[in-house]
Amino acid sequence: MLKTIQDKARHRTRPLWAWLKLLWQRIDEDNMTTLAGNLAYVSLLSLVPLVAVVFALFAAFPMFSDVSIQLRHFIFANFLPATGDVIQRYIEQFVANSNKMTAVGACGLIVTALLLMYSIDSALNTIWRSKRARPKIYSFAVYWMILTLGPLLAGASLAISSYLLPLRWASDLNTVIDNVLRIFPLLLSWISFWLLYSIVPTIRVPNRDAIVGAFVAALLFEAGKKGFALYITMFPSYQLIYGVLAVIPILFVWVYWTWCIVLLGAEITVTLGEYRKLKQAAEQEEDDEP
């Protein structure tokens, strides 16, 4: 009886182990950690230009003047754990200095921000091993759409949240709103990763695979924020070694860890489809055998 149960358990877990082995093989072949390091470097180079472009967009729309402040706090609180306040002060100071630049300098900021979009595009298509290239004009249009519409959609969602919060006319509705707002960062991360894995690759990505990969990445991202903040609080080795400059290596490590999570979600999305194809091919061979 015990042997039968063990055989059934082994039979059921065999596909999972096969999928995990395939996932690890793809991570190793794609040099995922190296890609994450490259993206982290470009992200740090593009951080101030990207924030400057985003805040300039909000300044162009007076209706988002109040929301832009909330969006700043939301970004730094949810995407830069533990040291968000310090980094926010420095970045806002850098952005204020960038406002004094000439038109040529402003164009340079936009190009640097678009460089990050190109690097993300290149890294994800490397993971999907796509050989097909988009037309340059189309790629530029996609990058510009993400750069402009992304912050505006985030601002609109925060504006809706700000409108819903004061509603106290229904206790049941108030409970629902509180629960939705509590999981809002997770939902936003999930949707963002799903769009990233669905739109950026130049080949068709099955929607269910993108949803699963994005959900895993969102969970890891939210857990990573809490774990990273806890680590910085409980083990302040960076503060002891670097002192007031500790914010720099902390930011480096967090950006690198974030890109590892993003690329891991992409690897999971790809592996789900590849494993399904391999399984179907194996079943087809078994059916063809006499």
Curated annotation (Swiss-Prot):
Swiss-Prot/TrEMBL keywords: Cell inner membrane, Cell membrane, Membrane, Transmembrane, Transmembrane helix
Membrane disposition: Multi-pass membrane protein
Family per record: Belongs to the UPF0761 family.
Gene behind this protein: yihY
Primary location: membrane
Residue intervals annotated with topology Cytoplasmic: 1-43, 125-139, 204-209, 265-290
Compartments it resides in: Cell inner membrane
Sequence intervals crossing the membrane: 44-64, 104-124, 140-160, 183-203, 210-230, 244-264
Domain of life: Bacteria
GO cellular component, one term: plasma membrane
Pfam families xrefs: Virul_fac_BrkB
Topology Periplasmic: residue spans: 65-103, 161-182, 231-243
Protein name, as recorded: UPF0761 membrane protein YihY
